[in-house]
Amino acid sequence: APVPVICVGNLTAGGAGKTPFVAWLFDQLASRGRTPAILSRGHGGSATGPTWVDPAIHDAATCGDEPLMLADGRDVLVSRDRARGARVIGEGGTHDVILMDDGMQNPYLAHSMTIGVFDGGFGIGNGWLIPAGPLRTPLAEGLARLDLAIINGTDETGFGARLPGSLPVFLAELRPDAS
């Protein structure tokens, strides 16, 4: 990609809070003078992309519910081909960083940084791979790809203690937006 790519994903199937974290990270970067764009596959939508999401003309059936939610005041590109989407963002000259929502298992786009988000109440479940468990990839292999881990909510399973000591770990908490 022509600009840095920060991948936000998780090692387990199901919700861990990745999308709200991507929204928060976008807003933090923008408030510091960066011009991020979000790259999403558009799960659940019919658009194959690359398509810039416009809430005024797109709906969840077209671009997916998460990209539509993220596009509220943010630049979001849906592209099933993540590498092509990253090129479109980078070559546009407007954005200086790409936030890839849920792309840890995509081997076609190099990441400058990979952030893993984990649900503190769920951890890694039974620790088994899909279909016997929730893991998308073997645990050691997935953890080796991470540059940073976010535990969303209270670490009820003790998963944080199992993370490598060299991996920076931060605790986060989802709060409803009152605005």
What are these regions (language model features)?
Residues 1-5, 11-12, 78, 156-157, ...:
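Proteins with a high burden of low-complexity, intrinsically disordered sequence enriched in S/T/G/P/A and R
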Residues 171-173:
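ASCE RecA-like P-loop NTPase motor cores
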Residues 1-58:
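Walker A (P-loop) phosphate-binding motif
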Residues 42-167, 178:
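Phosphate/Mg2+-binding loops and adjacent switch elements
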